[in-house]
């Protein structure tokens, strides 16, 4: 794809602000719902994916992202599914990198399972990507296979090595699963910090299909923090990225440890983000079923007037907060869509 025909964003007169005064300057875009893993907390093993014809083209994704950048988005994260499995996705990254060069965008990054990083890390760095988040829940090969169902741990570790060699900063995201990897968190933390990588722990979120097994995966991160505090000195850090994580410095390792706790302590008061699916649906809250179609106005006109108005309307309906709960009585999720569709 080429970016020559795409109008660059103009100067932003006023950033996007939701009804509660929160500035929206962070966009997460799922460029595919497909993935080469089948993580137990993310999707079904026999997952039915969207027909490829339903997905926005790479050119449409570029135009959509650029429209948000023109309206004040400063940070753009590409997600999935697994973003690196989408064919020709690097052409999208290279095209979007023009906004880094003009200064319209501060950061272009992505979240990945790491399986394709060895192949793409150098090119990502060449496009101006400076850091990536890698989803990795365990360093035990057998447990890794149980969690991901299809994954190869050595391939992910090779991808992380390639990313670091290419000069990319790497942060590890780990979903803590009761009876699975909860006892491995200290060793995972020491490994990550030993390589100069941050680690962020995430509570299981009630999205998609949840049965008894899924419900029983949940463990509150307050418990994990208490366990860590018995052997490590955790010092709260005042700095925040404006996102959901709350950080501590682990004095014994010198590394940073984050906690994302949507069930036990939500992060809504400082929410600065919206999510777009690979079909052009905008979700202004991860924990609500709210949705607005941006594909229709995107395709209705060659200019962005209709699209811009639709974005404004969606931002204007962003809720104050979510109500994530795990409904044990009815085995119902708070949100019916899978994380792989919403974008992790």
UniProtKB/Swiss-Prot annotation:
Cofactor comment text: Binds 2 [4Fe-4S] clusters. Binds 1 [4Fe-4S] cluster coordinated with 3 cysteines and an exchangeable S-adenosyl-L-methionine and 1 [4Fe-4S] cluster coordinated with 3 cysteines and the GTP-derived substrate.
Q: Record's superkingdom?
A: Bacteria
Q: Write down the chemical reaction(s) this protein catalyses.
A: GTP + AH2 + S-adenosyl-L-methionine = (8S)-3',8-cyclo-7,8-dihydroguanosine 5'-triphosphate + 5'-deoxyadenosine + L-methionine + A + H(+)
- Outline the extent of the Radical SAM core domain: 19-239
Q: Which GO terms describe its molecular function?
A: 4 iron, 4 sulfur cluster binding; cyclic pyranopterin monophosphate synthase activity; GTP 3',8'-cyclase activity; GTP binding; metal ion binding; S-adenosyl-L-methionine binding
Q: In the UniProt record, does the keyword Iron occur?
A: yes
The cofactors required by this protein are: [4Fe-4S] cluster
Q: Tell me the first and last residues of the signal peptide.
A: none
Q: Where does [4Fe-4S] cluster 2 bind?
A: 268, 271, 285
The biological pathway it contributes to is: Cofactor biosynthesis; molybdopterin biosynthesis
GO annotation, biological process: Mo-molybdopterin cofactor biosynthetic process
What PROSITE patterns does the entry give? MOAA_NIFB_PQQE, RADICAL_SAM
Is Lyase a UniProt keyword of this protein? yes
SUPFAM superfamilies named in the record = Radical SAM enzymes (SSF102114)
Give EC number(s), comma-separated: 4.1.99.22
> Which residues does S-adenosyl-L-methionine bind?
41, 81, 135, 205
Q: Any idea which UniProt keywords this protein has?
A: 4Fe-4S, GTP-binding, Iron, Iron-sulfur, Lyase, Metal-binding, Molybdenum cofactor biosynthesis, Nucleotide-binding, S-adenosyl-L-methionine
Q: Which PANTHER family match?
A: MOLYBDENUM COFACTOR BIOSYNTHESIS PROTEIN 1, MOLYBDOPTERIN COFACTOR SYNTHESIS PROTEIN A
What biological function has been recorded for the protein in this entry?
Catalyzes the cyclization of GTP to (8S)-3',8-cyclo-7,8-dihydroguanosine 5'-triphosphate.
Binding partners and assembly: Monomer and homodimer.
The record's comment on protein family reads: Belongs to the radical SAM superfamily. MoaA family.
Q: What is this protein called?
A: GTP 3',8-cyclase
The upper taxonomy is: Bacteria, Pseudomonadati, Pseudomonadota, Alphaproteobacteria, Hyphomicrobiales
What's the gene?
moaA
């Amino acid at each position: 794809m080429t970016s020559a025909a795409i109008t660059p964003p103009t100067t932003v007169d006023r950033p996007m602000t939701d009804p509660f005064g929160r500035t929206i300057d962070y966009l997460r875009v799922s460029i595919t719902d497909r993935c080469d893993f089948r993580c137990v907390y993310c999707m079904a093993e026999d997952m039915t994916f969207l027909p490829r014809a339903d997905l926005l083209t790479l050119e449409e994704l570029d135009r959509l992202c650029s429209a948000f950048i023109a309206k004040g988005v400063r940070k753009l994260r590409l997600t999935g599914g697994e973003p690196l499995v989408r064919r020709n996705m690097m052409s999208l990254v290279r095209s979007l990198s023009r906004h880094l060069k003009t200064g319209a965008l501060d950061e272009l990054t992505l979240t990945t399972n790491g399986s394709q990083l060895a192949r793409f890390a150098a090119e990502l760095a060449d496009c101006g990507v400076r850091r990536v988040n890698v989803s990795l829940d365990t360093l035990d090969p057998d447990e890794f296979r149980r969690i991901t169902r299809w994954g190869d741990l050595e391939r992910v570790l090779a991808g992380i090595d390639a990313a670091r060699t290419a000069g990319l900063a790497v942060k590890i995201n780990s979903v803590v699963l009761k009876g699975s990897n909860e006892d491995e968190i200290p060793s995972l933390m020491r490994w990550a910090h030993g390589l100069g990588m941050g680690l962020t722990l995430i509570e299981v979120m009630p999205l998609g299909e949840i049965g008894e097994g899924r419900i029983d995966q949940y463990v509150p991160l307050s418990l994990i923090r208490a366990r860590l505090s018995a052997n490590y000195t955790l010092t709260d850090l005042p700095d925040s990225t404006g996102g959901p994580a709350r950080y501590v410095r682990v004095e014994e390792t010198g590394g940073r440890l984050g906690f994302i706790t949507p069930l036990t302590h939500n992060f809504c008061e400082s929410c600065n983000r919206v999510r777009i699916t690979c079909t052009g649906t905008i979700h202004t809250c991860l924990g609500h079923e709210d949705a607005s179609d941006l594909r229709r106005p995107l395709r209705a006109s060659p200019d962005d007037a209709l699209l811009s108005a639709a974005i404004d309307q969606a931002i204007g309906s962003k809720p104050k907060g979510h109500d994530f709960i795990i409904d044990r009585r009815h085995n119902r999720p708070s949100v019916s869509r899978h994380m792989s569709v919403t974008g992790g």
